[in-house]
Amino acid sequence: MGKPLKSVFKKEHRDDVSNPSANPVFSSVAEMFLSRRRFLQMGAVAGAAASFPFLLKPENALAAVSQPSALSKAVSLGFTSIPVSTDDTVRVPEGYIARPFYRWGDATGIKGNMPEFKFDASNTADEQAAQAGMHHDGMAWFSLPQGEENPGHGLLAMNHEYIDNGMLFTDGTASWNLDKARKGQNAMGVSIIEVKKSGSDWEVVRPSGFARRITVNTPMQLTGPARQQTLMKTAADPQGERVLGTMQNCANGYTPWGTYLTCEENWSDIFVKKGERNALEKRYGISDSDESYRWSEVDDRFNVDKTPNEPNRFGWVVEIDPYNPDSTPRKHTALGRFKHEGAAVTLAADKRVVTYMGDDQKFEYIYKFVSDNKYNPADRDANLQLLTAGTLYVARFNDDGSGEWLPLVFGQNGLDKSKGFESQGDLLVKTRLAADAVGATKMDRPEWIAVDPHNSGSVYCTLTNNSDRGKEGKAPVDAANPRANNAFGHIMHWHEEGGDPAALRFKWDILVLAGRTDTADEKAKGSMKGAEFGSPDGLSFDHQGVLWIQ
């Protein structure tokens, strides 16, 4: 008989705390800087759907803090908001329809390999590698033909974040073996599917020369300073240049040159070490048990006692070329190693590439990467190298509303051998420890980041929640987070100096506190008029400059 059902659900290690540093927490910084009157009071808000309920037009947000009359009104999108409900059903506004499109087990569309889904869960591991994975998450659109704007035909790149073992097999987790682990590994990763509009409906093109599945066992290349570092070498890869697979792919990003960025988030859930954990393993949340995935029981890659450096090969941003199904995905170590939620890409004033990233765990940090070289729209081959070299920064939020980006560079700010760093590559494997050392500001689970396409240097970040707020030994309640056991979260905004994303200084403020509208309790009340929401996560601008919040 399999393990109890409760043991096969996803374990939320993002809810653990792995940061023991004495760095300032954002709540205490915000308390010194903000007062209740400074929160933006948003007016009319349109509700889009149960999963994307709020739309804001936050132009010139910082100016609006001191000049409330300057706030732009929310844009009406022409449909009626969906009321709050606990019904177990998908609901959309009147005049819209929703239907399943690409379900777990649907054929991806790979030529000559399109297995049908078997509802008794008897599909093999090899069949799963040609089918949609489980638990879809971040995704991005790439028009076809390449280089043209075509809203009716394109490629959809989609993450498959995690799995439920209890649903993958006919007998659940009984008689656990390597083949079962392989099927689970093939149900994670990324799908590339070709989609096309047909009349008023959409269809997945099958077969397609673009169709592809990327899984936990797909060969990948390592790039950047951590390539060939001692901490990246294993018996299977003694040079530290190649790695198998990507997993726990949460949010995403996309580049101006037409590639997909998939982000490895809760990868530490997979690894188990029974022996004593070192400081690096503790800082990244490596555990001594795993009742959810159980790969470490049958696959030594995920048994840290046997393969100690394998965890170091995860926690990166992976670049995939959706237009070239024969290309090798690349893990870009220059962008740092942590629990990447997403990667928001924009261009600096001088055309260098800037990528904003959040580390989605309690009291972790916000980062940005600035490339060494510049984007050239006429040279895609050169652009494909832009994320291999540059400078990684981590944010510090000061109590006067200013902020600065602190470089994580070997030999600067005390980041040297005396602090346990051997080189730039070694430092990037230990990104969290480097951010601790320079005094970055602890945040409340940074999730998605969105760059305003109509206001250069204006950036927004969801801080989803923090149930440890106010607990003994943790950050206290404060003006910016006025509730213990903060279940609602907030959204923050910063504007880079001079409107340049590559700037090293910025001004910050709070866009909105999430919460309820039916209470006068300041510990639970949101600051947005006319609507309520909690635990903001996904964040994206549309072509009108409307900010969509999940």
Could you tell me what each predicted segment is?
Residues 32, 38-64:
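N-terminal export signals
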Residues 89-100, 113-127, 200-240, 320-337, ...:
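Blade-edge beta-strand/turn elements of extracellular beta-propeller
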Residues 143-146, 255-256, 347-350, 453-455, ...:
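Residue-level detector of Asp-centered blade-edge/turn motifs that repeat once per structural unit
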Residues 178-184, 188, 201-213, 364-434, ...:
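Beta-propeller fold recognition
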